[in-house]
């Protein structure tokens, strides 16, 4: 099954219930599965049924991703003598948590008693927060990968003039890429402040 079809189905059934759609993909899939009865005969395992998850599982075999670690393991990895993950990955994760908090307030506001006529307004804000959160989560590993590319470039052979030229170009390309990633993080963090600002102004004050 295509991931988009499952997510769209989850949003559809949530909207029919006038519930916020700004929730995790995992929750949207769960709603779709329950509403469509896909688990009536046997358990529905998204990792084995959804095309994108199957391909991602195959592509990531043997690769350790930061975002798959527990919080404790992530902190321990950061504290280790390895130079990565560093400030860039940590900043991206902190930004993702900030976006998640904005979505939390939006979701709580969407379901606040007495605000029934505003559920869709807050649902839209929760969706925006989720988009920023998703992008920033991706940047957690992307920042560390960018750093590793620089290290790989520096390790290239440099005996002949051709090798030296190829190594220099690889270092320049990797360094340029490594500057683009934190810029993306800053841009996403800045833009997600719009959700935090809106929720501070119009969101549930008890949230």
Regions found by a protein language model. Give the residues of each.
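Polytopic transmembrane helical bundles with strong interfacial aromatic enrichment
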Residues: 61-70, 76, 184, 188-195
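A structural-propensity feature for long, helix-poor, extended segments
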Residues: 111-157
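Amphipathic alpha-helix face/heptad-repeat signature
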Residues: 90-97, 125, 132-139, 174, ...
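Amphipathic alpha-helical interface segments
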Residues: 143-207
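Inter-helical turn/loop segments and adjacent helix faces that build the functional surface
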Residues: 108-119, 199-207
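Long, contiguous binding/interaction regions
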Residues: 1-69, 166, 170
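Short, hydrophobic/aliphatic alpha-helical segments
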Residues: 65-85, 201-205
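Conserved phosphate/anionic-ligand binding catalytic regions in large, soluble enzymes, centered on
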Residues: 1, 78-105, 206-207
């Amino acid at each position: 099954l295509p991931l988009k079809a499952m997510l769209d189905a989850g949003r559809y059934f949530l909207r029919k219930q006038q519930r916020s759609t700004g929730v995790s993909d995992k929750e949207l899939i769960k709603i779709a599965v329950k509403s469509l009865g896909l688990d009536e005969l046997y358990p529905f395992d998204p990792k084995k049924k959804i095309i994108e998850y199957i391909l991602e599982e195959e592509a990531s075999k043997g690769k350790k991703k930061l975002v798959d670690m527990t919080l404790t393991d992530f902190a321990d990895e950061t504290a280790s003598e390895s130079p990565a993950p560093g400030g860039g990955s940590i900043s991206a994760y902190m930004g993702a948590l900030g976006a998640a908090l904005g979505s939390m307030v939006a979701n709580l506001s969407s379901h606040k008693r007495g605000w029934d006529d505003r559920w869709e307004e807050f649902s839209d804000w929760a969706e925006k927060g989720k988009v920023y959160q998703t992008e920033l989560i991706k940047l957690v590993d992307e920042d560390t990968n960018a750093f590793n590319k620089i290290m790989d470039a520096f390790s290239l052979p440099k005996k002949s003039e051709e090798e030296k030229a190829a190594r220099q170009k690889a270092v320049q390309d990797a360094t340029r890429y490594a500057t683009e990633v934190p810029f993306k993080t800053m841009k996403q963090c800045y833009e997600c402040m719009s959700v935090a600002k809106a929720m501070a102004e119009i969101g549930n004050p008890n949230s």
